[in-house]
Amino acid sequence: MPEPASAPTPTRRGRVPRTPRVLRILVPALLILVWLTAAGIGGPYFGRVDEVSSNDRTAYLPESAEATQVQALADDFSGSDALPALVVVTSEDEITEAELSALTDAGEELTSLEGVIDEVSPPIASEDSLAIQMFVPVDADADVGTVVEQLEQELATEVPEGLTVHVTGPAGFSADLAEAFAGIDGLLLAVALAAVLVILVIVYRSLLLPLIVLSTSLFALCAALLVIWHLAADGVLLLSGQTQGILFILVIGAATDYSLLYVSRYRDELRHRESSWAATVSALRGTVEPVLASGGTVIAGLLCLLLSDLKSNSTLGPVAAIGIAFAMLAALTFLPALLYAAGRVAFWPRRPRYDPASAQEPSSVTGRGVWGRVARAVSRRPRPLWVLTAVVLAVGCIGALSLDADGVPQSDLVLKSSSARDGQAALGEHFPAGVGSPVQVVVDEEDLQATADVLAEAEGIDSVSVTSADYPSGSAPVTAEGIQAQGPPGAPAPDPTVVGGKVQVQGTLADAPDSPAAEQTVRELRTALDQEGFEEIVGGVTATSIDTNDASAHDRALIIPVVLVVILMILMVLLRSILAPVLLVATTVLSFGTALGVAALVFEHLFDFPGADPAVPLYGFVFLVALGIDYNIFLMTRVREEALQRGTREGMVRGLAVTGGVITSAGVVLAATFAALAVIPILFLAQIAFIVAFGVLLDTFVVRTLLVPALTLDIGRAIWWPSRLWRAGGS
């Protein structure tokens, strides 16, 4: 344990109250023990997140959405909660009778697989005889990825040579998502931690200190995951793969940033104080306010997501807020305790030596180091500098106008090769592309025929059917003459399945269910059915996509202004000013616009992405504004502290010089952790990774280094208007 605290030297840095030796030993030991216990209990939950998470898009829609209401009735109409897997078999030549017989036998064998809960439909040949399709009912509560993998393996051995097999449909795409998210608790975490470790080793040129900082981030994540898992298990929160990935990255990045701030203060105090305890207390005093202000601002911004109609967004708010809270807590309790226990050895081989003279030396450091030179350069001609910087950033914003954020097809959500995507393409070549994912209309029984007529007249509908337990396939065809019978002439027509006076009419889409054409068809159907005066609800895969995208667009329009107002109010309280917060928020928004503009150009011309989810700009905004304002908070709280003693100009120059290194390191760490999201082959996460990583670097090296300091220097003491600091002449 470190040496006892000697009598504090009365210097400009202030006295540290004398603390009994027993407390100096007991408090750090207790803190370390508590965090070790939390990490020990929470660590195993990394492997159990799948138990309480779901990637079902319907589950995240509001209960008022039509697609949600239709999904809630699906089990009642079908008699099971099966998720359809669509087997598509193609051939370059016409499929022979022998091959068709072999496929029939293969389909019958599939019923014995675990997770297949009903009879597999017989093979249905395409008109050109170059493909067949079979419907396999998969238990929605089973591990869909495993079931689909077993289907592919079984078919690979049973299907005759020369035939190509794909498993697509809702089950196939669900399996793709499950496989893509499988690397979240392994690959993503490993890449993020490795990136942070490399950066910390470069920053500190030490072996032990980076491990201490990294352990702080990991312990914070373990504790946060422990709490979140139990909240999700109790149904308080809904977790998805993307929420889990963002949580991991956010906690590691934020905890490391806060740790960097504390370590910088602590190392400085060790040079001025002989006692490690006095240095710890003094470092905490200087770190608590900016960390709490920064973390509190991020939490407030994230909690604005609670206003979202989508549960995927409203859940991310509290999940991420819990993560940030534990990141702050770990950086302000576990890290100081661990560093105090390790003493100056933690910085080996560059241990900070106690230098009594340094405590009495003048406080101006602007003449030393890279950031001292940067601060002086900015102070020479601030007005031309901030004008030029603002113009360049504004030009970058223009690209945001070309961002296509109206949603992407389900088949493009996964970036890697996909059997489900290939199967969907093959399906569209030989069958109506919407087979297996029809539009579903729940309507009063007496309106069945009229509803079927509206669907049949729609240009994008290939055929119409009604759910019927009496029909072998479960859906009986409906034409202008009514429900069609199966069997010899004169056979009676089957009765539709009626649930609470309602029937389910299905329309097979002519286009792929995740295509813009299919979405347009469903929107037109909703309008046409409403005009007929039916009391109907329209659901299905396409309707789910429409309702999700519409809710996302609504959230974007509502939440972004609320986040701005909340952060602005927090900054006004923190800086006791009106003008400074307005300028800080404006510069951060400008930075976000530039990041979004550059991202739009990169996505379209470099990566050739098909578009973006409507939630991408919202997530990018919340993370960049909430996290980007962090660095301005770190900078301006120090500037205000210095301005109280030296005036605004000298305070700005000194504040930039003193905080430049640590804030830059924090920005690089946060950018690296968010960039790690790109290792998960999900389009949404890859786009968020680029926008946030690029935006954070832009904020770190341009906005916080050039734009904000130059603006502050040009405006002068008026930046603090209408606070007492402004009335006192800036000092």
Residue ranges and their predicted role:
Residues 55-57, 184:
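Short, charged low-complexity linear motifs
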Residues 1-50, 116, 139-405, 533, ...:
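Membrane-embedded transmembrane helical bundles of large multi-pass transporters/channels
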Residues 58, 358-361, 410-412:
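Charged, low-complexity surface segments at secondary-structure and domain boundaries
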Residues 7-9, 87, 133:
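Short stretches within intrinsically disordered, low-complexity N-terminal or propeptide regions
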Residues 37, 57-61, 67, 91-94, ...:
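N-terminal extramembrane/targeting module of integral membrane proteins
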